[in-house]
């Protein structure tokens, strides 16, 4: 199983990986972009992902934290300076490849996580489609505060 998780916030924030609520059967989800922060409503839940009280993704297996802790922290530091505007620019591919080369982690939102036909799309289009009813975020700057690519 392979998955991407991209954490997005309206402000820079510290985020800890919480692996306490994972279930081995939660394997149907292949990609999600997740807003964190109480000020942003989450309109839907995705199978296989639990959202904690602070809005962060809760992983399923405890071994993910120990195995990816250093990679997660390195990626978080790298992504914390990148803005929403940078990720929806024409440089998205170059940014992704640079991160992949340095950290071995992809930053790719994947459409329709419950569908078998996955394809990469820009962060901009993912957010616009997922949050198209939330006009108040149209001019908001978002920060990538963490990104994880993992296998099990």
How should these model regions be labeled?
Residues 1-38, 142-152:
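Short, extreme N-terminal segment that most often corresponds to the first beta-strand
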Residues 8, 60, 69, 73, ...:
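Compositionally biased, low-structure terminal segments
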Residues 24-118:
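Low-complexity, serine/threonine/proline-enriched polar segments
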Residues 1, 109, 113-152:
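Acidic, proline/glycine-rich low-complexity IDRs
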């Amino acid at each position: 199983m392979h998955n991407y998780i991209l954490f997005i916030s309206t402000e820079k924030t510290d985020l800890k990986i919480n692996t306490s609520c994972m279930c081995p059967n939660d394997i149907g989800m292949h990609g999600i972009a997740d807003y964190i922060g109480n000020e942003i409503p989450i309109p839907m839940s995705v199978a296989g992902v639990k959202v904690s009280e602070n809005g962060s993704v809760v992983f399923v297996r405890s071994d993910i934290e120990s195995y990816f802790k250093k990679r997660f922290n390195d990626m978080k530091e790298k992504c914390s300076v990148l803005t929403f505007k940078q990720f929806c620019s024409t440089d998205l591919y170059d940014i992704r490849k640079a991160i992949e080369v340095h950290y071995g982690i992809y930053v790719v939102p994947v459409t329709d996580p419950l569908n078998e036909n996955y394809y990469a799309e820009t962060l901009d289009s993912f957010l616009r489609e997922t949050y198209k009813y939330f006009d108040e975020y149209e001019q908001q700057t978002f920060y990538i505060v963490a990104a994880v690519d993992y296998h099990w």
